[in-house]
Amino acid sequence: RPGGKKSPPPPQPIQVKVNQIGYKPDDTKTVIVTSKDDEKFKIVDAKTDETMFVGAYGELSYDKSAESNVRHGDFTEFKTPGTYKIISSPSGASYEFSIGDDLYDDVYKDVVLMLYKQRCGTEVTKDIAGDFAHEACHMQEATVYGDTSGTKIDVSGGWHDAGDYGRYVVSGAKTVQDLFLAYEDYGQTADDLGIPESGNKTPDLLDEAKYELDWMLKMQDAASGGVY
């Protein structure tokens, strides 16, 4: 800038890629580097910089999803719980990541609470949703377009979708399916997410799924069985 300080250079993208949440001890663990020059990598303790593991990258290959040439390094055999980063020369360091058994507890809660924050047709409270809190919304009846009789139906409820106020049966049904699968696999006892229904002796995953299902039933035409 004329007469001012020079702007700092833009930050360089991290070239050493890991799962930033981390890995369970027995998970397959892979590091990816977007450079042809890196041959080896080392895992260092994030607090002490002590080298904990040394590994080698495989051959350079094209990753279609990344649209880039990459090299993969495997560190599955390293299982020690802790917080680490990977140093790779000449590309630099990865973000910090962890190895442990409870890594996904907070992620699970964040995902399900996100659905609560997207609830439509009810107050979403600040003590649970923070900045996403809002009053009950979209409570008015909606016109069925294409129906010449002027039919209006109650479509309150469900989840807002995709960062706006749209609500859709198809994407809602897929999300409900995912909640049911998560319940079958992991969630029979999960009743501590802090949503209004918590503590009602029904797992919170099912409570959240029911909130969407109640809306989906409103979206079903009684005569044809089809959905709006």
What are these regions (language model features)?
Residues 44-46, 52, 58-61, 111, ...:
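Catalytic cores of eukaryotic secretory-pathway lumenal/extracellular enzymes that build
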